[in-house]
Amino acid sequence: LRGNQVHQGSKMLKSSFLVIQVMFRRWKRRKMQLQVKAAVTLQRAFREWHLRKRAKEEKSAIVIQSWYRMHKQLQKYAYVRACVVIIQKRFRCFQAQKLYKRRKESILTIQKYYRAYLKGKIERTNYLQKRAAAIQLQAAFRRLKAHRLRRQIRAACVIQSYWRMRQDRVRFLNHRKIIIKLQAHVRKHQQLQKYKKMKKAAVVIQTRFQAYIFARKVLASYQKTRSAVILLQSAYRGMQARKMYIQIPTSVIKIQPYYRAYVSKKEFLSLKNATIKLQSIVKMKQTRKQYLHLRATAVFIQQHYRSKKLAAQKREEYMQMRESCIKLQAFVRGYLVRKQMRLQRKAVISLQSYYRMRKARQCYLKMYKVVIIIQNYYHSYKAQVNQRKNFLQVKKAATCLQAAYRGYKVRQLIKQQSIAAVKIQSAFRGYSKRVRYQSVLQSIIKIQRWYRAYKTLSDIRTHFLKTKAAVISLQSAYRGWKVRKQIRREHQAAMKIQSAFRMAKAQKQFRLFKTAALVIQQHLRAWSTGRKQHMQYIELRHPVLMLQSMWKGKTLRRRLQRQHKCAVIIQSYYRMHVQQKKWKTMKKAALLIQKYYRAYSIGREQHHLYLETKAAVVTLQSAYRGMKVRKRIKDCKKAAVTIQSKYRAYKTKKKYAAYRSSAIIIQRWYRGIKITNHQYKEYHSLKKTVIKIQAVYRGIRIRRHIQHMHRAATFIKAMFKMHQSRIRYHTMRKAAIVIQVRYRAYYQGKMQRENYLKILRAVNVLQANFRGVRLRRTLRNLQIAATVIQSNYRRYREQTYFNKLKKITKTVQQRYRAVKERNILFQRYNKLRHSVIYIQAVFRGMKARRHLKTMHLAATLIQRRFRTLMMRRRFLSLKKTAIWIQRKYRAHLCTKHHLQFLLLQNAAIKIQSSYRRWMIRKRMREMHRAATFIQATFRMHRVHRRYQALKQASAMIQQQYQANRAAKLQRQHYLRQRHSAVILQAAFRGMKTRRHLKSMHSSAVRIQSRFRSLLVRRRFISLKKAAIFIQRKYRATICAKHKLHQFLKLRKAAITIQSSYRRLMVKKKLQEVHRAAVLIQATFRMHRTYLTFQTWKHASILIQQHYRTYRASKLQRENYTKQWRSAVIIQAAYRGMKARQLLREKHKAAVIIQSTYRMYRQYCLYQNLQWATKIIQEKYRANKKKHKALQHNELKKAETCVQASFQDMNIKKLIQEQHQTSIIIQKHCKAFKIKKHYLHLREPVVSIQRRYRKLTAVHTQAVICIQSYYRGFKVRRDIQNMHLAATRIQSFYRMHRAKVDYQTKKTAIVVIQNYYRLYVRVKTERRNFLAVQKSVRTIQAAFRGMKVRQKLKNVSQEKIAAIVNRSALYCYGSKAQCEAVGSEGVIIQEWYKASCFACSQEAEYRSQSRAAVTIQKAFRRMITRKLDTRKCAALRIQFFLQMAVYRRRRANFVQQKRAAVTLQHYFRMWQTRKQFLLYRKAAVVLQNHYRAFLSGKHQRQVYLQIRSSVIIIQARIKGFIQKRKFQ
């Protein structure tokens, strides 16, 4: 009846909960719709207000910009003009100084060469004389040096012998000293060891002797005390024996009835308990066998089915990924080949252009040299022919012609340079704008990607928290028909398994109820028979125990009343607790059942609908998916619009701040300009007149300076001619004097020579003989010494050469061997590493399998042998800790090599490990549940036995209550198991689907990212090709070679990246299929580290090369800008405006391209999801509201386009005004052009242009190098961020795992503490009981002593003394014993007198003794009852605590699971947010740097244009003035 009532109540609760949930969901849906509508209206209002505000701000900014530009241009004009005046002054001064220096240098060189000739002649004579003297001195010095060397060698030999002897002696003395010291230390150590041994022996002897003396003393004292103790013991034992003799008959009479009742009761209860125990064990074993068989079959079916499904699914995924990888590889290789062909063609074209340029340059140089030579000859001829009179007129005419010619030449040059500069500027601006657009586009795409990821995460999280069924349905609707098909199959299989399992459970429950009914019937029959026997026994005993039962009945009734009241209170509280618990569990179960029932009912309805109307469902799904895709596109657009609006707001705010500061500055300057505006015309006229006067004055000053220089040159020539003639005269005179002196000396010398020769011949004969003898001797000695020296020197040279060769060969051999050994060791290490990793993987798999087997065996052993549970649990905990430590250590080793691994692989490994851990925890939880269930049943059985043994009267009630309670517990346990099984199945299915969807999503994201990067790369390459096509005419052979080298390196890097990517994909698939992740990860890490090292090395070399080329080009550029500062024209500003206008148009076109690209990307996704292609158009036509929204967006875009066109129109007006002013200036300038000089000066201008193009090409190359370096830096930074994120995830995961371990340990400690506290409590209660028992015994002893005293009262004192003396003498034979007994007898007499004194109060004492007896009996019964109640309460509390701990563990597990899920969600949100912020910061920084660079560059270009235009105007005006003067 109670089960039916509970079932009806649960049904009512289910229905009420269903109604409440439906109403709550409707209310929540309505609330969400209202919130969405309100948000949409607010967004529209905010955007309209923002657009209006932006239009106003742009108008104000345009006005401020126009004023600010005008002010900046005026300021720059004044500065440029001052600089031009200074440059002209310095240039003219430099020209005059140059002419003067040339002439002075020519004069000085002539003087220098002549003086050098004279000095050389004199020095030659001196040199010959000195040479002869030096030869003689050298011969003498060498002789003396050889003699000294011989002596030194002999002395060195003697010194070396003495030194070696001394060294040997010193070594010998040192060795002797060391040996003596060592011998001394060894002897000292030996003596110390001997001394320590002797000291130890002495100490041992002393301690033994002292111990012997102390033992003798202790033995003597011990014998004395022993004799005294023996006397006391004998006296006490005699007294105790007398007491026992009196107590035994009384206690025997009392114990006999109690013992007989106890024995009969015990036999009856033992038989009853044995029968109950046997029945319960037999039934438990039967049910256990059935349950295990059903469980094994269900697990085997589930595992087989899941493995089969997983294998099929993995095979399909692997084939898809393989096909996509093959397609990508083919596409990339074809693209690389095409790119190489294009680059080779470009290199050939650049070589041809360089060769033609070189040929033209050689022709131009030849012509230029010829022209210069002709001009020089012509000027010299004119200077010679013309007279001094016509010199001034000719000079004036020449200066006028030169000025006009130079002005024309400069104008032509500037014009061509301006055209080239305009082209280069337009190309560079286009390139810079394209780069900027690409960076902005990439940043927008990244922001959109991250925002979409965040949006999808938040949507998934909200849907998941609402209802699991809704999440599953939405995921299945979103992610494809394959997942739904798989889920349906799994659902059908699960339904079958659940139905089979529920059938088995229902049968099991029916059998349990049946056995419980039989047990209750047996208990009732046994109780009725026992009751009858007990009544008969009571009727027989009734007349004997009437008197006792009267008092006992009275006390028992009181006690029963109290116990009944207490029991009523306890039962009420207990029922309240049970009902509350039931209600809570029923509520939770009802909620869960409602959830799962709804999920089941929805799934069933969907299944029926699917079977009935498949085509309709497909159409609805496709329509829904199309709607979802469009909705997502719309959301993405909205998100992009919001991001763009925020970014533009930030940009406009920043611009507004800058404009405001510039507006304040402009206002200040504008007030000054307004004041000086009316004086501007007067100042302009004055300026023109001043410039004219300055030009005339400078011309006059230069002409005067040239005249002065001409005069000085003529004077220097005359002086030089005079000096030359004077030098010639002096030389002739000196030569004549020298000839006279030499002739006279020659004649006198001839006479003396003849006399001298006669004497000399005789002396020579004598000297020759003497010298011959001496020379022969010295030659012999020298020859001997030379041979010795040569042999020694050759020996030394050969020895040094041999030593060098030996060292080199040794080093080469060592290095070669080291390299060889290194290679061998590396190969061995790789082999060992691979084998070790493979063995580790196999060993880990074996360990895991072994662990699972041991766990299964442990579960069976726990069920069979409960006594070994604790030891087994300890063993398993130790084993688990060892495995955990091993995993930690292996994880630590893996993390060292896993620093640069991808985040997705980390996530996959983490999911696998968490799944394995979850499976192990699940098994342990099931084991723990089984163990707790066994413990609970065993404790319940034990409590039942004790309770029946203590009290028979309440046996029937307790049996019924326990049977009811057991049924409820089994029902609850069944419901819990069913609930947990359903939860686990649902969690497993959800986990499986999530894992599959995650893998699909990750693979799709990877393919998309690779494809997007490929598309971006293609677009970038196309733009780069356009830039290269524009720049290819300006490049030289060095640039082409450099580009080829760079291309080869880039191709190598691309090939390595592709190969690494292919290896990664293949390894990942093998990891998923074969589960050999450890081996693949290790090889991939090694390969990737090597690749990264190679790429970094190549990148560093490239960066260094680029940086060096950039530095060289920068230096060339600086030299070039110094030489060609006047190469920019006013037209550059206009063309720059034109280029900006074109860039705006290109930007619009890029926006259209971006939209088309997005459309194309969505179309690709649409093609990939083929099932959604048929019904998008139908739903698109039907969904007119969305079309209206899109039309509204298009109108908004049109409004923005109109505003932009209006702004462009204003800008065009300003440009047209500037263009008109430039055209007027050009008209005035073009009047002075001459066509003949244009053809003559065309070739040098072309060469200048080519040089300029080379420099610009170098500059663009440096910019490309910087961009590539920055991209590499960006990639490295992304890798570092990914690595940091991976380390943070790992640390978080380790923290979570440590936390889980800590919580499990904490719960185990709490359980142990509870057990220990119960044990302490039982111990204290036992102690209290023993203390009470002791006190009762003391009271009994006192009462018995009083009884003895009453008996001894009638005997005379003399008889008592005689009896005492006789007994004492009989017991103790010696006098000493008699004295001791006498003292004890005195004590007994005193005690007896005290007892006699107490007999006077006999009446009071009797009443007190009776009361004491009754109190004792009542107290004993009360203690026994209290102990029984306490034991029962303790057992109940223990049971309830165990259940509460179990519930708490389950609640903690659920909470931990929820907390883990929330933590993962928050961590992912934090990670995505952080990465988004990092990317946003990087994008903002890049944009700021790029804007600053563009603004500086633009200002520099404007400044150079204005400066060049001012210089040109001044030069042309001067040329015009000179021409007018000349005419």
From Swiss-Prot:
<feature type="domain" description="IQ 10">
    <location>
        <begin position="490"/>
        <end position="521"/>
    </location>
</feature>
<dbReference type="InterPro" id="IPR052318">
    <property type="entry name" value="CellDiv_DevSignal_Domain"/>
</dbReference>
<keyword id="KW-0677">Repeat</keyword>
<keyword id="KW-0539">Nucleus</keyword>
<keyword id="KW-0963">Cytoplasm</keyword>
<feature type="domain" description="IQ 15">
    <location>
        <begin position="709"/>
        <end position="740"/>
    </location>
</feature>
<feature type="domain" description="IQ 4">
    <location>
        <begin position="248"/>
        <end position="277"/>
    </location>
</feature>
<keyword id="KW-0206">Cytoskeleton</keyword>
<keyword id="KW-0132">Cell division</keyword>
<feature type="domain" description="IQ 19">
    <location>
        <begin position="904"/>
        <end position="935"/>
    </location>
</feature>
<feature type="domain" description="IQ 21">
    <location>
        <begin position="977"/>
        <end position="1006"/>
    </location>
</feature>
<feature type="domain" description="IQ 13">
    <location>
        <begin position="636"/>
        <end position="667"/>
    </location>
</feature>
<dbReference type="GO" id="GO:0051301">
    <property type="term" value="P:cell division"/>
</dbReference>
<dbReference type="GO" id="GO:0005634">
    <property type="term" value="C:nucleus"/>
</dbReference>
<comment type="function">
    <text>Probable role in mitotic spindle regulation and coordination of mitotic processes. May have a preferential role in regulating neurogenesis.</text>
</comment>
<dbReference type="Pfam" id="PF00612">
    <property type="entry name" value="IQ"/>
</dbReference>
<dbReference type="InterPro" id="IPR000048">
    <property type="entry name" value="IQ_motif_EF-hand-BS"/>
</dbReference>
<feature type="domain" description="IQ 18">
    <location>
        <begin position="855"/>
        <end position="886"/>
    </location>
</feature>
<feature type="domain" description="IQ 14">
    <location>
        <begin position="686"/>
        <end position="717"/>
    </location>
</feature>
<dbReference type="GO" id="GO:0005516">
    <property type="term" value="F:calmodulin binding"/>
</dbReference>
<feature type="domain" description="IQ 12">
    <location>
        <begin position="613"/>
        <end position="642"/>
    </location>
</feature>
<feature type="domain" description="IQ 16">
    <location>
        <begin position="759"/>
        <end position="790"/>
    </location>
</feature>
<dbReference type="GO" id="GO:0005819">
    <property type="term" value="C:spindle"/>
</dbReference>
<feature type="domain" description="IQ 23">
    <location>
        <begin position="1050"/>
        <end position="1081"/>
    </location>
</feature>
<feature type="domain" description="IQ 25">
    <location>
        <begin position="1259"/>
        <end position="1288"/>
    </location>
</feature>
<feature type="domain" description="IQ 7">
    <location>
        <begin position="394"/>
        <end position="423"/>
    </location>
</feature>
<feature type="domain" description="IQ 17">
    <location>
        <begin position="832"/>
        <end position="863"/>
    </location>
</feature>
<keyword id="KW-0498">Mitosis</keyword>
<keyword id="KW-0112">Calmodulin-binding</keyword>
<protein>
    <recommendedName>
        <fullName>Abnormal spindle-like microcephaly-associated protein homolog</fullName>
    </recommendedName>
</protein>
<feature type="domain" description="IQ 2">
    <location>
        <begin position="175"/>
        <end position="206"/>
    </location>
</feature>
<feature type="domain" description="IQ 27">
    <location>
        <begin position="1332"/>
        <end position="1361"/>
    </location>
</feature>
<feature type="domain" description="IQ 3">
    <location>
        <begin position="225"/>
        <end position="254"/>
    </location>
</feature>
<feature type="domain" description="IQ 22">
    <location>
        <begin position="1000"/>
        <end position="1031"/>
    </location>
</feature>
<feature type="domain" description="IQ 30">
    <location>
        <begin position="1506"/>
        <end position="1527"/>
    </location>
</feature>
<feature type="domain" description="IQ 28">
    <location>
        <begin position="1408"/>
        <end position="1439"/>
    </location>
</feature>
<feature type="domain" description="IQ 24">
    <location>
        <begin position="1123"/>
        <end position="1154"/>
    </location>
</feature>
<feature type="domain" description="IQ 8">
    <location>
        <begin position="417"/>
        <end position="446"/>
    </location>
</feature>
<feature type="domain" description="IQ 29">
    <location>
        <begin position="1456"/>
        <end position="1487"/>
    </location>
</feature>
<feature type="domain" description="IQ 9">
    <location>
        <begin position="467"/>
        <end position="496"/>
    </location>
</feature>
<keyword id="KW-0131">Cell cycle</keyword>
<feature type="domain" description="IQ 26">
    <location>
        <begin position="1282"/>
        <end position="1313"/>
    </location>
</feature>
